[in-house]
Amino acid sequence: MYTKEKINELMEKAQVMKKEMEKIQKDIKMTKIKGESGAGLVTIFMNGNYNCRKTKINDEIWNEKNKILIQDLITSAINNAVNKITELQKKKIILKTPFHNE
């Protein structure tokens, strides 16, 4: 049976965890992520909110003949950046939860 003290303790822990999660979310939003494809031929820069901030396309592939390739590389670079943000979120959140066993 839960006592008033136990309930208060749980509420305090929940508040601490909420503040930690807010800090993690803020940190992730401020993080800059670089996604690449084609061995660096296309680079996408995003922030932790999944907003694309910049796109770089290497001069080697920048011509009319490579249009389809460039489109594929841009898509791949965006997906690479999104995957990095997702992994960063998982790592930061898991490290701050009581489920982490380290």
Swiss-Prot record:
UniProt xrefs under Gene3D superfamilies: Nucleoid-associated protein YbaB-like domain (3.30.1310.10)
Entry keyword Amino-acid biosynthesis: no
Keyword ATP-binding attached: no
InterPro entries per the UniProt record, alphabetical: YbaB-like_sf, YbaB/EbfC
Alphabetized GO MF terms: DNA binding
Complexes and interactors: Homodimer.
Name by which UniProt lists this protein: Nucleoid-associated protein BCc_301
